[in-house]
Amino acid sequence: MDKKELSSLIVNVKDYPRSGILFKDITPMLNNAEAYNYAIDEMLSIIKKLYPDVTHIVSPEARGFCFGCPIAVRGGYNFVPVRKPKKLPRETNTVTYDLEYDTETLCIHKDALKEGDVVVAVDDILATGGTVMAIETLVKDSKATLKAFVLLGEIKGLLGSNFTKLPIHSVVEL
């Protein structure tokens, strides 16, 4: 498995979920154990090499969980789920942001992170940057330190990385 082969398993779906959107479908990659393991290994390697002081991985639902959970388990990190409203049972911090095709709200438990925690955010695809901004806000509001974003892929043409000054690392460019 290499990055080119991994990229070939991320399929473009035209006009989904709305007309004019080119959706990146990662399910063929998830359905290929070799590719999925390769992606997780590459992402974990970035974190271990560049951010040895990390204590927590945060990931947004739903596709971010596909990467954040196994990375947290394999790396020995705490995992913080970033969820949609009314999915977390206790008091939350919340942020609303714009996607390329909708408005979204994300939440974390208020006590999930604290000052002194060192965080890397893990997600699937960086597109327009809305989720990046939301996660950065949620982590900052918790007083933890967000070090970087580690992603399966980045759609460079959408300039989502312009919405943060933090490092963004992606396994593949889309």
Short names for language-model regions:
Residues 66-75, 136:
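Short Gly/Thr/Asp-enriched flexible loops that form oxyanion-binding sites at enzyme active sites
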Residues 52-61:
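Short glycine-rich phosphate-binding loop at a beta-alpha junction
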Residues 8, 133-174:
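PRPP-dependent phosphoribosyltransferase catalytic core
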